[in-house]
From Swiss-Prot:
The protein's enzyme class: translocase
UniProt xrefs under InterPro entries: NADH_UbQ_OxRdtase_su1/FPO, NADH_UbQ_OxRdtase_su1_CS
PROSITE patterns to which the protein is assigned, alphabetical: COMPLEX1_ND1_1, COMPLEX1_ND1_2
Gene Ontology BP terms: aerobic respiration
Function: Core subunit of the mitochondrial membrane respiratory chain NADH dehydrogenase (Complex I) that is believed to belong to the minimal assembly required for catalysis. Complex I functions in the transfer of electrons from NADH to the respiratory chain. The immediate electron acceptor for the enzyme is believed to be ubiquinone.
EC number: 7.1.1.2
Protein name per Swiss-Prot or TrEMBL: NADH-ubiquinone oxidoreductase chain 1
Gene Ontology MF: a single term: NADH dehydrogenase (ubiquinone) activity
Lineage: Eukaryota, Metazoa, Chordata, Craniata, Vertebrata
Keyword rRNA processing: no
Transmembrane residue ranges: 2-22, 70-90, 100-120, 146-166, 171-191, 222-242, 253-273, 294-314
Catalysed conversion reaction: a ubiquinone + NADH + 5 H(+)(in) = a ubiquinol + NAD(+) + 4 H(+)(out)
């Protein structure tokens, strides 16, 4: 039964990833006043399927000087970790209801750094290594603010369990009392998932395509899928944390519909940002985090610690 549950979670995610690639190409196309994919199937709807067949039937090449085992393990690990992060997300019921769901999410996103690092190192190419080092520095840096913002939200929530966030936001979405946190969280998720304007890892002008430059066919597709899985997961997480979806125990379907619409809107905003903004310079990226976000999040964290005490109430213990 548990295996069926896992499959029922993974298969829709992979389908969503496949069609997100199509949505992205369509949205970017229309924003640049062109059509986007429109040949394969009606309105280009079968394009992701054609892409998948092409990628997975090609011969997976690898450089003769690369470290074989690590070269193969890295993309598999990237996708596995990306899918594992969906386990504690309440939609409205999580696959496994963890007491420390948030901590699990943080741990998994930290582990995802290793797959990027290994892929860059195992490729035995300067471009790949520089891309990987950039990605790791960026991910680790932005995780600091993500963790502090999460802590601030959880202080209002009163528990590390993600399911209680639904109860906390029954009357008021957390985006309203903590909108500065939400803004910083959203920008940090962009940086965490290596999306434009923070896609320095794949700076085409200087690094060809970043850490996955030596990958082709199947393994490349796995990295690609991991990236998009992470994008959808981060937006789902943002929805749970700040845009508490409407939950009625008698009609749990309403929650899922509400949750999906909000996640979709956030994902489209990711694409909109990609179409609108140029890439940051590396020092600007680090300056934004260490000089702007970090002091502000620390101050807001202290504010959230003192808030329940000043209002002479303790956080709800669930």
């Amino acid at each position: 039964m548990f295996t069926i549950n896992i499959l029922l979670l993974i298969i829709p995610i992979l389908l969503a990833v496949a069609f997100l690639t199509l949505v992205e190409r369509k949205v970017l196309g229309y924003m640049q006043l062109r059509k986007g994919p429109n040949i394969v199937g009606p309105y280009g709807l079968l394009q992701p399927i054609a892409d998948a067949i092409k990628l997975f039937t090609k011969e997976p090449l690898q450089p003769s000087t690369s470290s074989t085992s690590m070269f193969i393990i890295a993309p598999i690990m990237a996708l596995t970790l990306a899918l594992t992060m969906w386990v504690p997300l309440p939609m409205p019921h999580p696959l496994i209801n963890m007491n420390l769901g948030v901590l699990f999410m943080l741990a998994m996103s930290s582990l995802a750094v290793y797959s990027i690092l290994w892929s860059g190192w195992a490729s035995n190419s300067k471009y790949a290594l520089i891309g990987a080092l950039r990605a790791v520095a960026q991910t680790i840096s932005y995780e600091v603010t993500l963790a502090i913002i999460l802590l601030s939200v959880l202080l209002m929530n009163g528990s590390f369990t993600l399911s209680t966030l639904i109860t906390t936001q029954e009357h008021l979405w957390l985006i309203f009392p903590s909108w500065p946190l939400t803004m910083m969280w959203f920008i940090s998720t962009l940086a965490e998932t290596n999306r434009a304007p923070f896609d320095l890892t794949e700076g085409e002008s200087e690094l060809v395509s970043g850490f996955n430059v030596e990958y082709a066919a199947g393994p490349f597709a796995l990295f690609f899928m991991a990236e998009y899985t992470n994008i959808i997961m981060m937006n789902a997480f943002t929805t749970i944390l700040f845009l508490g979806a409407f939950h009625n125990p008698y009609m749990p379907e309403l929650y899922t519909v509400n949750f999906t619409i909000k996640t979709l809107l956030l994902t489209i905003s990711f694409l909109w940002i990609r179409a609108s903004y140029p890439r940051f310079r590396y020092d600007q990226l680090m300056h934004l985090l260490w000089k702007n976000f970090l002091p502000l999040t620390l101050a807001l964290c202290m504010w959230h610690v003192s808030l329940p005490i000043t209002m002479s109430s303790i956080p709800p213990q669930t």
